[in-house]
Amino acid sequence: MLNLMLASRYFNSIIIVNDSTIRKASKDSKKMIAEYRWFQERDEYNHPNVYNLQVGDISSYDMEYIHGRTLSDIYVNELIPVEDFCTIIDFILNKIITMRKQSVKYEDYRFRESLNFLYAEKTTERLTNYGFNLNWKYKLNEIEIPSLKEIIDTCEVSIDNTDLSYVHGDLCFSNILIDDNFDVNNIEDHLYFIDPRGMLPNKSKEITSVGDYKYDIGKLAHSIIGNYDLIKANLIKADKVGERSFTLYDETTQYKNIVKEHFFATAGHKEVWYNIMIHLFLSMIPLHDDNPKHQDTMLANALRLYLEKVNLFRKK
């Protein structure tokens, strides 16, 4: 069976060099350099060893081959007891909070304004470039929904200096590996972070591991509360029942619901997690152009999260 570490995105290629090494390559040299530098600098995160960075028309680096599964595969298929999975979530959240307690260098405060691109600016730019009319209104399960512009405007995510941290930057379940010798009593030695962002999200793409710690937690929420991995696995689907009307079918299991409740109990029931998730789903729609069904489901799911947010945090 192909090791699940080897799943790659369309802009990367991953090949097996030997039983202990894989090679990740891309035409995006800056991305390869940024990832490699993150691995070199961020020893606080357990990650595979990397070496042999090569920069050229096709840039690459070699990485220790971790035999195991992604957290996404474990979650989708419920491969470990739910109590153990919740313990893993606690470990990751504690890692994020521990990193936040490490003060970033004073000169890195300059990155704060650039990080704002992560949210409303990126969402608006991607959707308009893809051809969305942000003034269109939608229906979800027969419920009237405001326009995407109104939704985006209500999903404010502010960043101040206390939010700056040394982050992973793309902390989704598919970028977290659990090796085959997993021991819930010793998670640190069996959990590995891969595919960090390593650069600013705006057009400058300046290489840095500084980011908004809330974004890392929001990416976890995107998998747990937002059901991203279940959508990718075709376990949650939406039907388009009109030009801008959807029916969303959500049949999450008790296992998933326990993990959701545990996340909220640990990370807090905060509106900002919903705001980040909504931005993530909307901004990802153009990136899934190869699968219109996933695009419909992601849009419908963003509308679902908006309704949940309104019901949870509506001003009394």
Sequence positions of predicted segments:
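Hydrophobic transmembrane helix bundles of membrane-integrated enzymes that assemble
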Residues: Q54, V76, F132-E156, I176-L177, ...
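Conserved kinase catalytic-core helix
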Residues: R42, H47, S72-D160, Y166-V167, ...
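Active-site activation/catalytic loop segments of kinase-like enzymes and analogous catalytic loops
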Residues: L191, M199-H262, I278-K293
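Active-site acidic catalytic loop and adjacent metal/ATP-binding pocket
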Residues: E150-G211
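Phosphate/pyrophosphate-binding loops and the adjoining catalytic core of nucleotide-dependent enzymes
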Residues: L2-S13, V17-N18, I92-D108, Y228-I236, ...
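Extended charged low-complexity segments that act as oligomerization/scaffolding linkers
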Residues: S20, I33, Y51-N52, I58-H67, ...
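All-alpha amphipathic helical-bundle segments outside canonical DNA-binding/catalytic cores
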Residues: G268-M277
